[in-house]
């Protein structure tokens, strides 16, 4: 039951009937008032309407309040504050209906079909296949996997996609790194001067050993880099992608589709999209300024460019190098043309914050290719700083100090704790991941705090289950009313998250629900009147147990969309 939507529909009906004004985004028209004594909910709609109809704020607020008072089955009290806000208290029947609905909904509270099976492509992680994932990748993987779960729940026809960048210089460097270790192992002696620009993790040694033991007949013919690359490049790529897929599987993440950059090259997609952009008038040749850090030896030459400045970018972007080869950006353009060709007019891409410069250029590409009929939402996420024993652990993908998912799991952290931790801050903010905090069974551990609330609910319901009938009129304590209002926020909050992608708000909401529940539990430890089960007050006990069941279902609904199993006992 979406209580905010119901209130929004009523408010829309009242405003339209009185002023002839049509409202949008009904779920956002109601909020919690600053002080609980003002009401269950509050709206500032009078401020918007007064400007449009050119009447005084007080006059508009009073007219709307009178209209709301006609819905006697919904509102117990409607008042106008001096500032023009309209505050309402709901009837006990409304709250009874709400609690009954949520307590009966064991798996789907908060979700609705707003996607209507619209095709949507969500591309995320897409890390270069040069080794196992680091924590920055893991943060993006978890964020967008949970976002994908939400999009599924809200009825979108979602395709989870991974783009394999397997045609660039990083793969050449990966192959060379393995080749160096391969030659060392054949000589049975490691060099003290391993190239500093190479990938130096232990997994490089493991790949080299695998090649020698698995393909003994090919070893003697691959002691030169070219022959080695021709023979083993695809094998090495397969092995590193298996590492990535293994890490993702441990996190509970899978994909519907993998697209290889190499296949786009082989299918001449770059040439195809260049022709399309040229025909549409979005190509030119011009001399571009030197890249950052290369001004000393930079020689200006004319290059084929995409006119991204037409779409708000600060410079046009090179598609072809002076030697005739295509730029990395040209592959990106071809890839998004490939998405459009597959019928995706709505795309979401998750990128690291270091790719912020891609937002305008990729948005421009999609607009240029689709004529404005398709849209792309590029959502950025920041780095992760890992702490052990209060000391930061540096992350690096190219040296032996690489911190992998297995390293974190071996420290005692569970996958559920990792998934929760990745959402404890906005994705735009650098995340400090404190391993010590998440292994402690205490309120300092944010997942423990939430799971303990769910386990307490389960414990109460094992002792006594509520009857079917709920009388919310029995729930009059401030802590109870605060908790009910918080539960009612979930459906509208989830809709906001589906639009914005701000999935960290899930953990913030879980903490708020748990905090209000623990407050009520702790009050019962001090005063008997706050206890959930009071033997000589069966009606109050039943109402409180229905509230407990609603809390349990709400916590479970959000935890499950995060792929975290709610704890029944702790």
From Swiss-Prot:
GO terms for molecular function: arginine-tRNA ligase activity; ATP binding. The keyword Cytoplasm applies. Its EC number is 6.1.1.19. GO terms for biological process: arginyl-tRNA aminoacylation. GO terms for cellular component: cytoplasm. It catalyses: tRNA(Arg) + L-arginine + ATP = L-arginyl-tRNA(Arg) + AMP + diphosphate. Its main location: cytoplasm. NCBIfam families: argS. Belongs to the class-I aminoacyl-tRNA synthetase family. Monomer. This is Arginine--tRNA ligase. It comes from Neorickettsia sennetsu (strain ATCC VR-367 / Miyayama). The gene is argS.
